[in-house]
Amino acid sequence: MSDIPVSKRAARIEYAIRDVVVPATALEADGHEIIKLNIGDPIAYPGLPTPEHMIHAFQESLSRGETGYSPSYGLTELRSAISEDERAKGWSCTPDDVYVCHGVTEALQIIFTATLEEGTKVLAPGPHYPPYMAYPQLFGAQTIEYRLNADDGWRVDFDDVEAKMDENVRLLVLINPNNPTGNVAGPEEIDRLISIAEKWPNCMIIADEIYDELDFTGTQKSVASRSLTVPVFTLNGVSKVYYAPGWRIGYMALHDPTNRLGAVRDGIERLLRSRLCASTPAQMGYL
């Protein structure tokens, strides 16, 4: 009998840094030595442990029996703490603007689900984190890469961004600091990207700032703190700065300076409720 067919959506999905593990694991089982450069897991390297106070808080949460469901948008105390952190970065974030997710990757899935339709586009830096390419395909959307100039420290090529923007671009992505190049966009570059996005009324910015505290240049700034016009989804979490990628705890924070995200916010909240919640003990560890 022939195989039961897989959905076209699933068949299209590729995730290069994980997909390569399948043949590599087979080779390793055959006795070959494999040098693993595919995924940046800080826990895989000596000297980068998850902070002890976070582990203790996680364990204490388990000891107290806090293993039930949390609110779908995240623990109230954690949302409040995150909003304080974001306000310290220069914008008026409230606890209601913060949504706790199963890592930044789930936050991306929810944002894409709430904003993309057939024929829409995501404009993301090339190179970038694979989900920016993979997940939009589920919705019949397309990811277009804008150029990072290797001869100029991997800075954003703004002429290329301008040339690739159109009315179908719903999401303009800035990963800052950038993964994998390490480039840090400063305030002037952020302002220029915002000025491009604001020419297109239906365009929103994704500010992936998961590496923000690993900036050693002193130039990294919150995109939300710079935008007076364009809606911004700020993404962050525990995976990189706190060396806890396996906890799968991250968040999105919505900056809506001109009050245009009402319908999108409603869609995001519906999606969050439909998937129940993020891990309660892991949230307590983050808190």
Regions flagged by a language model, labelled:
Residues 63-198, 212-226, 233:
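Conserved core of the PLP fold type I
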Residues 55, 228-287:
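Conserved core segment of the aminotransferase class I/II
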Residues 209:
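Walker B catalytic acidic pair
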Residues 27-30, 139, 199-201:
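Helix C-cap/helix->beta junction micro-motif
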Residues 176, 205-206:
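Residue-level marker for buried hydrophobic side chains located in beta-strands
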Residues 3-6, 10-103, 110, 277:
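N-terminal small-domain helix-loop-helix segment of the aminotransferase-like
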